[in-house]
Amino acid sequence: MGRTSKDKRDIFYRLAKEQGWRARSAFKLLQADETFQLLEGLTRAVDLCAAPGSWSQVLAKRLYEPLPPEEREKVKIIAVDLQGMAPIEGVKQLRADISKESTAEAIIEFFGGEKAQIVVSDGAPDSTGMHDFDSYVQGELLLSALSISTFILEEGGSFVSKIYRADRTSRLYTQLKRFFKNVCVFKPSASRNSSIEAFVVAREFCLPDGYKPCNLTTEWHDQPESWVGRKKESPPVVQVPFVAYKGELDSDRTYDLGENYVYKEPVQQPLTAAYQDILQKTSQVNIKYEGIRVIHDEEMLKKWLENDENKSEKLGACVT
């Protein structure tokens, strides 16, 4: 399979390289902004799980670059991720864990004591191929993004995050409705129809009365215990609003390259592999396997044992 094969099969991958985006996922945020006008007039934005930086590019392109140089300093964009990424003009990078309160404090400090007007997150776990498990882990990641948003998002702010459509979608929707007046699930055309991926678009942020920001992955706020013992009564049915982007391009379709096509390399390769820490840890572990050696000759066995005292101890009672 040639290197142009993916350019044929994935029109958004091809366009991302031609237009200078680090990943095809940039079009997902662009289409969300086109549909809901999320970024108009904003000056403070947070990109969670930002690497390799395509959504941070979109934020910079829409909020930072259109302004004259003397006015750009008022726009503050911060990208948060445990992994490093190549610099983007107008974007501050913070290598930190989004589940830590200290990360929220660092973000607010970057904004000079103010809070963000929008929080976006395109983070996703490594896929296992088991859809139920993957959707569960993705839901926990979404709740982590929502948790830190309750610390850093200003009243009336917006929140956009990846979600996997599954049986937990209604529960996550219920969680979001506690904090946002307007919530829907959005499917951009840059997201393949064959994928369970979608995005929650939540607007008009408002903390409930008496609510104290906490970790939503460990605390429930829809009071499931109130249904315990009510065997004859079922929880209310939740209908989640769904919005699909109407575009001319289809991410599942193959497009001809055209006569003037010129192959382009990806805009920015990852600085480090996501699994680099695991490689470093396992490199210190001795996982060498010593095969079993069967010796039938008694003289050979004695010579072999004489070469290494540890072998005699290991064999012990096994040698007769």
Curated annotation (Swiss-Prot):
The keyword Methyltransferase applies. Its EC number is 2.1.1.205. The keyword Transferase applies. It comes from the Eukaryota. It is found in: Cytoplasm. GO terms for biological process: cytoplasmic translation; neurogenesis; tRNA methylation; tRNA nucleoside ribose methylation; wobble position cytosine ribose methylation; wobble position guanine ribose methylation; wobble position ribose methylation. GO terms for cellular component: cytoplasm; cytosol. Disruption phenotype: Decreases methylation of position 32 in tRNA(Phe). Impairs long-term memory functioning with no apparent effect on short-term memory. Sensitizes flies to infection by Drosophila C virus (DCV). Leads to derepression of piRNA pathway-mediated transposable element silencing, whereas small non-coding RNA levels appear normal. Leads to locomotor defects and a reduction in ovarian size. RNAi-mediated knockdown impairs small interfering RNA-mediated silencing. Simultaneous knockdown of Trm7-32 decreases lifespan. One of its GO terms (molecular function) is tRNA (cytidine(32)/guanosine(34)-2'-O)-methyltransferase activity. Keywords: Cytoplasm, Methyltransferase, S-adenosyl-L-methionine, Transferase, tRNA processing. Pfam families: FtsJ (PF01728). The active site is at 162 (proton acceptor). Gene3D superfamilies: Vaccinia Virus protein VP39. Methylates the 2'-O-ribose of nucleotides at position 34 of the tRNA anticodon loop of substrate tRNAs. May require WDR6 for methylation of the nucleotide at position 34 of the anticodon loop of substrate tRNAs. Plays a role in neurogenesis. Requisite for RNA-mediated gene silencing. Modifies position 34 in tRNA(Leu(CAA)), tRNA(Leu(CAG)), tRNA(Phe(GAA)), and tRNA(Trp(CCA)). Belongs to the class I-like SAM-binding methyltransferase superfamily. RNA methyltransferase RlmE family. TRM7 subfamily. This is tRNA (guanosine(34)-2'-O)-methyltransferase. It comes from Drosophila melanogaster.
